[in-house]
Amino acid sequence: MENLTNIFLFLSNENEGIQLNTDIFEANIINLALLIVLVINVAKDVLGSILSARKASILDKIEEADKKLNEADKRFTEARLQWSQANIFGEDLEKKTYQRINAFHESQNLKNKDALLREYFSTLVVLDLKNEQVQKQVRNYVMELALIEVYGVFTKLVANKKFQENYSNYSVLLLEKLIGEK
């Protein structure tokens, strides 16, 4: 330790003391300032291009999800059309059953009338069950498509290292901006 102190005293006496170098060219201050400005400009361009690429990717995913939604909507419309056709068939069947009931009521006895009423109500129950089944299938299909899409997007985002790095960098930049405003 004593040797280190002696070396320091020797150097300070030889150079007439310790002084601040005010020559900006010799101290490399201009070079450092230019390097800092260059790094800031390059980082801004790179970050801008990364963010614009991410934005384009997100817009593509939104368009893809919109297409899938339109497809699910189309299938839902088809199912609704089938449901309305089943209702028309049911109404037609209902009219025919009423006609049969009236014809048998006039010509047949009470037993035949009871059998037709049971057939009518069982037909209504079957139609209601089919209607509920179709609606349930459509709801399940739409929910399945939505869950598959959400799971896929979420999995890709979580697995993407660049997204995680960009999100971390973006959070740091926002925090620095927030601290700088106070």
UniProtKB/Swiss-Prot annotation:
Drop me one GO molecular function for this one.
proton-transporting ATP synthase activity, rotational mechanism
Source organism superkingdom: Eukaryota
How this chain sits in the membrane, per its record, is:
Single-pass membrane protein
Keyword Ion transport on this protein?
A: yes
Provide the Gene Ontology terms for cellular component.
chloroplast thylakoid membrane; proton-transporting ATP synthase complex
- According to its UniProt record, where is this protein mainly located? plastid
Q: Name one Pfam family in it.
A: ATP-synt_B
Q: Where are the transmembrane segments?
A: 29-47
Record keywords, A-Z: ATP synthesis, CF(0), Chloroplast, Hydrogen ion transport, Ion transport, Membrane, Plastid, Thylakoid, Transmembrane, Transmembrane helix, Transport
Which InterPro entries does the UniProt record give? ATP_synth_b/b'su_bac/chlpt (IPR002146)
Q: Tell me where in or outside the cell this protein is found.
A: Plastid, Chloroplast thylakoid membrane
* Role summary: F(1)F(0) ATP synthase produces ATP from ADP in the presence of a proton or sodium gradient. F-type ATPases consist of two structural domains, F(1) containing the extramembraneous catalytic core and F(0) containing the membrane proton channel, linked together by a central stalk and a peripheral stalk. During catalysis, ATP synthesis in the catalytic domain of F(1) is coupled via a rotary mechanism of the central stalk subunits to proton translocation.
Family (UniProt)? Belongs to the ATPase B chain family.
User: Quaternary form?
Assistant: F-type ATPases have 2 components, F(1) - the catalytic core - and F(0) - the membrane proton channel. F(1) has five subunits: alpha(3), beta(3), gamma(1), delta(1), epsilon(1). F(0) has four main subunits: a(1), b(1), b'(1) and c(10-14). The alpha and beta chains form an alternating ring which encloses part of the gamma chain. F(1) is attached to F(0) by a central stalk formed by the gamma and epsilon chains, while a peripheral stalk is formed by the delta, b and b' chains.
User: What is the additional note?
Assistant: In plastids the F-type ATPase is also known as CF(1)CF(0).
Query: Which protein is depicted?
Result: ATP synthase subunit b, chloroplastic
Q: What is the lineage of its organism?
A: Eukaryota, Sar, Stramenopiles, Ochrophyta, Raphidophyceae
